[in-house]
UniProtKB/Swiss-Prot annotation:
Protein name in UniProt: UPF0304 protein YfbU
Family as reported in the entry's similarity comment: Belongs to the UPF0304 family.
InterPro entries membership: UPF0304_YfbU, YfbU_alpha-helical_sf, YfbU_helix-hairpin_sf
Organism encoding this protein: Escherichia coli O127:H6 (strain E2348/69 / EPEC)
Top-rank taxon, per record: Bacteria
Length: 164
């Protein structure tokens, strides 16, 4: 991340204020303040991750994925024979924290800050699927979008989607 000295000074002062305003995270803010003040290039790359960007299209796709899982669970709940499909298969797992951190961060933002999909179970890992999921979700979305009644899925349609 490239910053002028003036930008670094402003950010350093912000971290100094955050240290006073948020004592529970003071050590983290002091560390970031030191990195900014001294211009440690390698560590400043951490800020690139924190100040990253998700394009609108990506955000909409993630919401679409979450909506698909909502539809899967609602449809599963309405099945006469729920035993044929394990409920865990229609439960949203999230994204991989190691390789899909920005997607995972957006999911957490949507649930914890925006208050959407609060009925989703974050599990003990907070929507960290611990395996890359993006490509799997894309295949699932393609099948789901082809279904004529996306919120009234049959057991066969649910199986086609989750096995995509």
């Amino acid at each position: 991340m490239e910053m002028t000295n003036a930008q670094r000074l402003i950010l350093s002062n912000q971290y100094k204020m955050m240290t006073m305003l948020d004592p529970a995270n003071a050590e983290r803010y002091r560390r970031l303040q030191t990195i900014i003040e001294r211009g440690y290039g390698l560590q400043m790359r951490e800020l690139d991750r924190e100040f990253g960007e998700l394009k609108e299209e990506t955000c909409r796709t993630i919401i679409d994925i979450m909506e698909m899982y909502h539809a899967l669970h609602v449809s599963w709940s309405n099945l006469h024979d729920q035993q044929s499909i394990d409920e865990r298969r229609v439960t949203f797992l999230g994204f991989d924290a190691a390789t899909e951190a920005r997607y995972l961060g957006y999911v957490r933002f949507m649930v914890n800050v925006e208050g959407r999909y609060t009925h989703f179970d974050a599990g003990t890992h907070g929507f960290n699927a611990q395996t890359p999921m993006w490509e799997k979700y894309q295949r699932m979305l393609n099948v789901w979008h082809a279904c004529p009644r996306q919120y009234h899925l049959s057991a066969n349609e649910i199986n086609q989607i989750i096995n995509a």
